[in-house]
């Protein structure tokens, strides 16, 4: 397989950003993010238009979209905790693959990196790297794969998916039809000079491996049934609580990882465990904010399980449900931004503390289910597959398996040692494909 790079440049907004918009203050929630890049990969099997025309239209509409999301084309100033909206541009690459898309998808998992390979220079070899980068990959069959990377400082998955849908709409029907993003978080929750939170742990020297696993709908139905049977001695109230598919898969994966923690040491007892999820706070508080506000607006859910001997899936879903329910109930009453900021900081503080201490199994998850990633339509239909790439730390991402249905695709990023065990786990293999 050969990859030819046809274009590599910094793409700027089609219209210069006005002087009064050239600084965007970051919120406290932006400030506390780990500044890593999140990758998104969108597969489109066949394009109806000439590929040259398609690429030109994608480039011009992306440039127009940057006039609305002008901060994305700027640069991060960590000293002042602002984004300098100076129109320096985002990374932009066009490549051509000499194979058909279906052949590419049959290849190694590492092929996903090829879909973003042209972006590495932008993101790692400059003193002030772009906050986002896009790579367009054309295939022999007329298929297209769009790889995107966003610095987490500029926003969460809600913000990233909104940007991609805005670009797609600009390409499909014109920039005038695209809604302007809103930036209301920083005035309510300004950045702080001193953050009283521990740093996240360092994973320097650890080699992480990323693999994709799919729980089809029928597998989830079977898993739910077997989890209920496993809890045969549970009370009637517990049996009535039907966990969401995200909680179900999270609990099953956590159970598998707990068993992995015991196996090499031949232990009958595991360490206590902490299941960590990120909860979108939009529409959950009483704050005077737009429902589609851009930026980072989520809280960390720390669900602890103190069961150290053969935890059941229902034990773990109960821990998750309890932790999520408590946060939902608390934030629903809050109309004070300082209280929300304090709650978020406390959740991050607990997460980083336990993550770094190493006395518990800490399993970090992020659910992208129900975000409109499968709605990103540039004019030739929705993507046939949406995926992500590796992360610089242990993380398990849950995504919708396909445009329709309730299956879940899991992108697991684990240490090389843990991934070997994970792929051989007998129960996992019976549910995933």
From Swiss-Prot:
It catalyses: benzyl alcohol + acetyl-CoA = benzyl acetate + CoA; (E)-cinnamyl alcohol + acetyl-CoA = (E)-cinnamyl acetate + CoA. Keywords: Acyltransferase, Transferase. Its EC number is 2.3.1.224. One of its GO terms (molecular function) is acetyl-coenzyme A:acetyl alcohol acetyltransferase activity. The active site is at residues 152, 377. It is an enzyme of class 2 (transferase). InterPro entries: CAT-like_dom_sf (IPR023213). Belongs to the plant acyltransferase family. Involved in the biosynthesis of benzyl acetate, a major constituent of the floral scent. Can use benzylalcohol, cinnamylalcohol, 3-cis-hexene-1-ol or heptanol as substrates. Has some activity with 2-phenylethanol and 2-naphtalene-ethanol. This is Acetyl-CoA-benzylalcohol acetyltransferase.
């Amino acid at each position: 397989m050969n990859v030819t790079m046809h274009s590599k440049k910094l793409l700027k907004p089609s219209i210069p950003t006005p002087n009064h918009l050239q600084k965007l203050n970051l919120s406290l929630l932006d400030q506390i993010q780990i500044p890593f890049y999140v990758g998104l990969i969108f597969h489109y099997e066949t394009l109806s238009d000439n590929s040259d025309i398609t690429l030109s239209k994608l480039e011009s509409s992306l440039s127009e979209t940057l006039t609305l999301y002008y901060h994305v084309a700027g640069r991060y100033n960590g000293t002042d905790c602002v984004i300098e909206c100076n129109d320096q541009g985002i990374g932009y690459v066009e490549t051509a693959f000499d194979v058909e898309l279906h052949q590419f998808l049959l290849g190694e998992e590492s092929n996903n990196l090829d879909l973003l390979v042209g972006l590495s220079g932008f993101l790692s070899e400059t003193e002030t790297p772009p906050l986002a980068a896009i790579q367009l990959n054309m295939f022999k069959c007329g298929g297209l794969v769009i790889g995107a990377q966003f610095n987490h400082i500029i926003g969460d998955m809600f913000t990233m998916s909104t940007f991609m849908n805005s670009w797609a709409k600009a390409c499909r029907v014109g920039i005038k039809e695209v809604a302007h993003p809103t930036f209301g978080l920083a005035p309510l929750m300004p950045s702080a000079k001193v953050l009283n939170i521990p740093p996240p742990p360092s994973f320097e020297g650890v080699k992480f491996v990323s693999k994709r696993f799919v729980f089809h709908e029928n597998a989830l139905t079977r898993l739910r049934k077997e989890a209920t049977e496993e809890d045969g001695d549970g009370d009637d109230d517990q049996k009535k609580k039907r966990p969401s598919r995200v909680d179900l898969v999270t609990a099953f994966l956590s159970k598998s990882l707990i068993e992995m923690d015991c196996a090499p040491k031949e232990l009958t007892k595991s360490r206590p465990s902490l299941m960590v999820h990120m909860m979108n706070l939009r529409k959950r508080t009483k704050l005077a904010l737009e429902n589609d506000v851009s930026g980072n607006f989520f809280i960390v859910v720390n669900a602890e399980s103190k069961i150290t001997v053969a935890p059941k899936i229902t034990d773990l879903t109960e821990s998750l449900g309890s932790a999520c329910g408590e946060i939902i109930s608390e934030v629903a009453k809050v109309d004070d931004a300082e209280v929300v900021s304090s709650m978020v900081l406390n959740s991050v503080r607990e997460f980083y503390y336990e993550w770094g201490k190493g006395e518990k199994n800490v399993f970090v998850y992020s659910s992208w289910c129900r975000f409109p990633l499968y709605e990103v339509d540039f004019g030739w239909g929705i993507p046939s597959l949406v995926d992500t790439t590796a992360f610089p730390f242990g993380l398990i991402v849950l995504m919708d398996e396909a445009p329709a249905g309730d299956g879940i695709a899991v992108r697991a990023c684990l240490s090389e040692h843990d991934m070997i065990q994970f792929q051989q786990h007998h129960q996992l293999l019976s549910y995933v494909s």
